[in-house]
Amino acid sequence: NRHIIHHSCEEFNLACALRQSISETIHFGAILMIPAAVLGVPAKIFVILGPIHLFMQFWYHTRLIDKMGWLESVIVTPSHHRVHHGINPEYLDKNYSQILIIWDKLFGTFQVELADVKPVYGILRPANTWNPIIINYKHLWQLIQDAFRTERIWDKTRIWFMPTGWRPDDVALKYPINTIANPFEQKKYKTENSLSLLGWGYIQMSISLIMMFLTFYMAPEHGLFITGFLALFLMVNVFSYTSLIDGKKYSLFADGIKIAIICFVIFHQKIGLLNLNLNMKIFLAYSIISTLGTLYFLKTELNHLNTEMKSQEK
């Protein structure tokens, strides 16, 4: 589930490299480093290698760099990683290496980028949303639904251990899922939003980033409990404005949850509205303005967005 989120991007650029799962906060790599720490490897080694390892997996997410000569035989290059992200039959489940390409050559998963097969990016079951929260949990929710719907006990159990894309026969027949059969017929997800709505989305994203840093800055003052609720507020906020860009009515419901979270925090602190600190005033004012903005765009653009999305699905 967690790597599908990274691959759900239908473009291949540096922004794609930043599309990571929420569960990345609990990284398997950190667990695997515990034995090294126990054996006495200095902490500065981890501090040095961490950023290097991160950058070495970041830079090759680009279509602008062609093949790199002899380096193609040593390190993972943009060409190698374009193959890894391709949904073409020739490229599926290939080039898993992160830094040194030798591992794919040793385990039989290496594939060179073919001149006559241009990689098509994304996933075989398109996410079809701009909402990162939905993208994070969509595949997991599908597994839960399939496990519940299948009639065979054995399928309810093994679905959690089968390869990606596997579904019980009875569920696949009764509840078909849109899957890309021919990569070159892929229709990239697109919503025909007005410039005003796109501008609203950019403003919302910018404010969310500022409020995120503000939450970090004020964490010592608020403590873990309140900081946790403010983090939840930010996640619901992202859910709200990306759902609005998707043309979904439940974006307004998410705005209601935002206001409820802030009201709970105010109630928990046992202070009146007039005595709120600046941080809380900003969060409350933003929640109200954001909700009014959602109401406006739902009223003026929802019919237009739904019409465009239906025509795209056809």
Which positions does each model-derived feature cover?
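Membrane interfacial helix-start motif at the N-side
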Residues: 9-22, 180-201
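Short, charged cytosolic
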Residues: 1-4, 158-182
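Short alpha-helical linear motifs
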Residues: 69-76, 94, 141-145, 278-282
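A short structural micro-motif
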Residues: 54-55, 167, 263
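A membrane-cytosol interface segment of integral membrane proteins
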Residues: 118-166
